[in-house]
C-alpha cells in the first residue's frame, strides 16, 4: 500500500505570495509544508517544501514536495492508495472550511493535474493525532505516555495520551487559550526576534537568571490539579501587555542586554515548570515509564534534555 502524507495550505499556489506571513488562516498558521511517501509502512521519501522553493518555513501547498516524493518512489499520484492531510479543519473560531477531501483533491488537480476522483482517496487526520502517532510509531515502544504541544492545530494546542499496543487513549487536551507554543512565542517581538525564532529565545536563556522575572512569569499561569494548567491572561493581547510591562523591548538591530537574557531564562523556566507538572502527574496516573513528545514545543531540546536526565 502506498500512502502519501501532506501538510500545507489547502489552496493552490499563487506566484504573487512570497511572504510566509501571508499564510495566516483561521485554522492556524500554515508553515513548514511537507510531503512524505510510505510503502507498506516503510519510509520511501520525505521533504519540506522550503527545500525546493527556497522559501524558509514555506506554508504553501507542497506541490513540489509531492512531486519529489513520487519521483523517488517511481510512481504517479494515481498509484497512491491513501492521501493523508494533517488537519481536519478545526472548529469554532479556528475552523477553516477550505479543509475537506474535495478541496484537497481540487488543489491536487490544479497543481499536479490528477483525476478529480482522487477525493475518494483523501483522508483528513487531526493535527495533534498526527503529531502523537508520528512520535509513537517512530519510538518503537509498545506502550508510552505521549504528549503533544504546539501553537495550535485543529482548534487544540495539545493532547496527553496513553498508548498501549497501538491503542491510543486521550487523557487530556490543551485548549488554545492555554497553548504552550503561543505562550513561549509571545515575547519574541519584544526581544527583537522574528516569527519562528523560538530557538533564539531558547539559546539566549542559559545566559540569563530566571529568578529575576520568575515571580512575574508565575503570575501568567496556574498549575492545577490532575496535571492541568491554565494561562491567566484572558486574551493574547493581555499576554503581550504583560511582557510589555517587563520593559524588555528590544529593536531587531539593537544590542542584547542582560534584561533580555533574564526574560528568556524566566520564560524557559516557566515552560519547563509547566511541562514537568504535566508529565509527573500523568506518569504517576498511567504508570508509564516511557515518554514520546511531539509538536513544536517538543523541539525545545533544553527542556526535553532535562526530562531525560
Predicted ranges, named:
Residues 1-309:
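Short acidic/glycine-rich loops and adjacent helix/strand connectors
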Amino acid at each position: 500500500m502506498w500512502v502519501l502524507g501532506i501538510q500545507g495550505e489547502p489552496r493552490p499556489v499563487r506566484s504573487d505570495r512570497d511572504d510566509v506571513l501571508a499564510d495566516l488562516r483561521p485554522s492556524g498558521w500554515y508553515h513548514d509544508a511537507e510531503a512524505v511517501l510510505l510503502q507498506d509502512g516503510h519510509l520511501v521519501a520525505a521533504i519540506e517544501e522550503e527545500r525546493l522553493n527556497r522559501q524558509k518555513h514555506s506554508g504553501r501547498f507542497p506541490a513540489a514536495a509531492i512531486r519529489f516524493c513520487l519521483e523517488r518512489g517511481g510512481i504517479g499520484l494515481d498509484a497512491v492508495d491513501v492521501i493523508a492531510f494533517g488537519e481536519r479543519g478545526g472548529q469554532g473560531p479556528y475552523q477553516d472550511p477550505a479543509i475537506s477531501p474535495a478541496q484537497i483533491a481540487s488543489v491536487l488537480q490544479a497543481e499536479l493535474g490528477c483525476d478529480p476522483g482522487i477525493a475518494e482517496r483523501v483522508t483528513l487526520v487531526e493535527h495533534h493525532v498526527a503529531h502523537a502517532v508520528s512520535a509513537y510509531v517512530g519510538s518503537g515502544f509498545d506502550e508510552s505516555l505521549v504528549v503533544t504541544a504546539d501553537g495550535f492545530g485543529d482548534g487544540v494546542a495539545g493532547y496527553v495520551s496513553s498508548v498501549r499496543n497501538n491503542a491510543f487513549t486521550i487523557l487530556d487536551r490543551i485548549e488554545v487559550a492555554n497553548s504552550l507554543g503561543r505562550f513561549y512565542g509571545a515575547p519574541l517581538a519584544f526581544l527583537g526576534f522574528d516569527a519562528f525564532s523560538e530557538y533564539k529565545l531558547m539559546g539566549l536563556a542559559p545566559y540569563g537568571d530566571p529568578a529575576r522575572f520568575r515571580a512575574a512569569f508565575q503570575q501568567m499561569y496556574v498549575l492545577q490539579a490532575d496535571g492541568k494548567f491554565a494561562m491567566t491572561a484572558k486574551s493574547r493581547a493581555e499576554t503581550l501587555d504583560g511582557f510589555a510591562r517587563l520593559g524588555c523591548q528590544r529593536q531587531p538591530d539593537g544590542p542584547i542586554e542582560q534584561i533580555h537574557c533574564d526574560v528568556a531564562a524566566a520564560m524557559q523556566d516557566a515552560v519547563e515548570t509547566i511541562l514537568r507538572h504535566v508529565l509527573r502527574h500523568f506518569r504517576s496516573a498511567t504508570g508509564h515509564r516511557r515518554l514520546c513528545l511531539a509538536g513544536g514545543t517538543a523541539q525545545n531540546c533544553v527542556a526535553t534534555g532535562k526530562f531525560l536526565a
